[in-house]
Design a protein with these regions (language model features):
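Short amphipathic, basic-aromatic surface patches that mediate peripheral association
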Residues: 2-23
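C2 and C2-like phospholipid-binding beta-sandwich domains
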Residues: 18-29, 47-50, 61-67, 79-138
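Short linear motifs at secondary-structure transitions and domain/linker junctions
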Residues: 4-7, 52-57, 107-110
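Compact integral membrane and secretory-pathway proteins
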Residues: 3-6, 73, 124
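Tryptophan-paired
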Residues: 33-74
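Short beta-strand segments enriched in hydrophobic/aromatic residues
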Residues: 14, 34, 82-84
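Beta-strand-rich binding-surface signature
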Residues: 7-9, 27-29, 75-77
């Protein structure tokens, strides 16, 4: 499908922590990537460490631009993971808790996903969170 590709911005607005992976406060971080057809553009929020003292039911205002540009192909792949930090993902003693992953490929037929995607429930056996993000035309 050949079409004019718009200039887009993917903005991670909020994360509602329904249940973190720990008893009491959690230490939250987010990782993922956006691929417009030219390769994965990774991100981490915060860039290092974690967001401390996050309690169940708390909403985090993230407001981070994950990607900007004109897609190089007819696909815009958005992948966002929520994590509760413990001793690292590969720890045998107390690994980080995966709270859920959002993964979707937007196409011109979906208007590139333009609009607000609010309170998307994501969960694993270790926790649950609600993702809100927006894709905007520049």
């Amino acid at each position: 499908m050949s079409t004019d590709r718009p200039n887009l911005t993917v903005l991670f607005e909020q994360a509602g922590i329904v249940h973190g992976g720990d008893i009491g406060a959690a230490e939250i971080y987010f990782e993922g990537w956006v691929d417009d057809g030219s390769g994965k553009k990774p991100f981490r929020i915060p860039k290092s460490g974690h967001i401390p003292e996050v309690h169940d039911g708390q909403t985090l205002d993230v407001n981070a631009v994950l990607w900007q540009g004109v897609p190089a192909s007819d696909q815009l792949h958005v992948h966002i993971e929520g994590w509760d930090e413990d001793l690292g993902r590969n720890s045998k003693i107390n690994p980080d808790d995966h709270l859920g992953t959002y993964d979707h490929v937007f196409t011109p037929g979906e208007r590139w996903g333009v609009g607000r995607h609010a309170s998307i429930p994501l969960a694993t056996k270790d926790g649950e969170w609600l993702l809100t993000f927006r894709i905007e035309k520049a």
